[in-house]
Design a protein with these regions (language model features):
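Beta-sheet repeat architectures centered on beta-propellers
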Residues: 1-90, 100-109, 233-248, 253-255, ...
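Beta-propeller and closely related beta-pinwheel folds
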Residues: 50-60, 93, 97-102, 133-291, ...
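Generic beta-strand hydrophobic packing signal
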Residues: 63, 123-124, 134-135, 152, ...
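Short strand-coil-strand connectors
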Residues: 80, 88, 119-120, 164, ...
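Extended hydrophobic/Leu-rich segments
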Residues: 94-96, 115, 137-142, 420-426, ...
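Hydrophobic or amphipathic alpha-helical targeting/insertion segments
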Residues: 105-139
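A short, charged
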Residues: 113-115, 120-125, 146-159, 293-295, ...
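Short beta-strand/turn micro-motifs composed of small residues
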Residues: 118, 163, 211, 393-396, ...
């Protein structure tokens, strides 16, 4: 008997038992992984690392992107209250003439500049000009106190700010006029709901207004026709974990859910939970209000920086691949405190003031990208019989280097590994382009063992045999690596000559 698996793109699945997890032969779910991602929608590959982008010199509290006329710059705030604008095109770091009192900044792009607020600083606007002038917005609450620590959004040409149970909105096209009658104003304790607003986020033709246990939809273009309706009894923990992706708006509650527009009438409905496969992990998280989600559109991914109860930093990132509907895990060695999208890429910042460009290079700024992947326990057709596996092969993609450790867990025992060996397949039977240093005029040559030049393979796929000893009811495959030079790109698993041992 022969059993083969050519779709390894199931991602981590914590919702099934050990015996259930390996039943699906069409798509392989993962028992666990670290720094492994889906490769070409079918295989698995080691994730890329990160590299140092900028060193500010003190702990960073916030990152954001400011854009004007297709030119993007990075906004950086620090623990001492400094605000920097980094212009990458001119390699310039400009200090803004404003010192923050708070350490929890929120950002909102409006017109060509950016609005900011912290838990101790009122709303202000930074103009995107040569001097990055600061304009105080002077937003006061109903008791004439400065509004701080609020949620913000832009909707229908206005700035919307929510604090406690009140939503304030600016005059049309203005970021600092919250007083003009019949243009600016506020909405207070709508639907007799006195609960605090946790987040504001535009979605389609609506402004989604989230509270802890409910979400409302606001419509209209002027104070005369603004209207709010209760949509669902499912709320959001905070604004940092809400993202718009394609036709949906994802938000974090006791799981991750979505508002989605469906049907010919474009009706809004509440989608099903997308975090059910990793729901077990939620018991390890701390306060979910601190969760940060960023949409990495280039890779069709959402990166969730969940705060773990036993970790003061954001070392572990849960990545949702929404094309493959799969989850995988990224573990970053640096002490990450925040992240943002800048120029379409993911950037993170640590507690030492260093900013990193993520999903780049083969190391974490010089440190090895430690990786691990565990298959489910594979019963290979019949879970009630012990089976001898005479031949097992990894199908490897030789456009990538493969150098990893292999081990096997047997018969649903996840503690003890067996059959430990090393799989090594690097630049085998590759051709390299000729250059001016070659002694002849041939266009290409076989690569020497020590070559580090670009290569292409004669055969894209290669088979590497590995040993699985003894007769077993089920086997779990483990692939791992801890050295800088180790990596993997696996596109299939083949079990040949499988016999029932009865």
């Amino acid at each position: 008997m022969e059993v083969a698996y050519y779709n390894l793109a199931g991602g981590i699945n914590q919702s099934l038992t050990k015996t259930e997890l390996g039943i699906d032969t069409k798509k392989v779910n993962w028992a666990d992984s670290e720094n492994i991602e889906i490769y070409q929608n079918r295989g698995i590959v080691k994730q890329k690392g990160n590299t140092l982008f900028l060193d500010i010199g003190e702990e960073i509290t916030g990152l954001a992107e400011i854009s004007a006329y297709d030119v993007n710059k990075m906004v950086i705030t620090t623990i001492s209250g400094k605000i920097y604008i980094y212009d990458e095109n001119h390699s310039k770091k400009i200090l803004v003439d404003k010192t923050l009192k708070g350490i929890k900044p929120v950002f909102l792009n409006f017109l060509n500049g950016i609005l900011m607020m912290t838990e101790a600083d009122g709303l202000f606007y930074i103009k995107n000009n040569s001097k990055y002038e600061v304009v105080e917005c002077d937003l006061k609450d109903l008791s004439d106190n400065t509004v701080t620590g609020a949620s913000m959004a832009v909707y229908k040409g206005r700035v919307w700010v929510a604090k406690d149970a009140t939503i304030y909105y600016s005059a049309l096209g203005s970021y600092n006029d919250f007083k003009t009658e019949k243009d600016a104003g506020y909405i207070n304790e709508f639907h007799t709901d006195t609960g605090s607003v946790t987040a504001l986020k535009p979605y389609k033709d609506y402004l989604a207004v989230y509270k802890k246990d409910s979400v409302y939809l606001l419509t209209g273009t002027s104070p005369d026709d603004f209207a709010i309706v209760l949509f669902a009894n499912k709320g959001a923990v905070g604004a940092g974990s809400i993202v718009n992706v394609e036709n949906k708006q994802y938000f974090l509650s006791n799981g991750i859910f979505a508002l989605e527009q469906v049907g010919e009438l474009n009706q809004i409905q509440l989608g099903s939970e997308i975090s059910s496969k990793i729901k077990q992990e939620f018991s390890s998280f701390g306060k979910l209000e601190g969760t940060l989600c960023i949409h990495y559109e280039k890779r069709s991914q959402m990166w969730y920086f969940f705060p773990y109860a036993d970790d003061n930093y954001l070392h572990t990132v849960w990545i949702n691949d929404y094309i493959n509907k799969a989850w995988y895990k990224r573990v970053i060695p640096q002490d990450i405190v925040t992240a943002c999208i800048y120029n379409g890429l993911v950037y993170t910042a640590d507690n030492k003031g260093k900013i990193y460009k993520e999903d780049f290079g083969t190391t974490f700024n010089g440190e090895a990208v430690k990786f691990m992947w565990k298959s489910p326990f594979l019963a290979l057709s019949n879970p009630h019989h012990r089976k001898m596996i005479d031949e097992f092969y990894f199908l490897l993609d030789t456009e990538q280097d493969n150098d990893f450790n292999f081990s096997v867990y047997k018969d649903y025992d996840s503690e003890y590994s067996d059959d430990i060996e090393k799989i090594y397949s690097i630049h085998q039977d590759h051709l390299i382009w000729a250059d001016d240093m070659m002694s002849d005029d041939l266009p290409c040559h076989w690569t020497p063992d020590n070559a580090s030049v670009p290569v292409w393979s004669v055969n894209k796929d290669t088979m590497e045999k590995a040993e699985i000893s003894e007769a077993n009811y089920a086997v779990q495959l483990c692939v791992s690596g801890e050295d800088v030079t180790q990596s993997c790109a696996i596109i299939g698993l083949q079990f040949r000559e499988v016999y029932n041992d009865d």
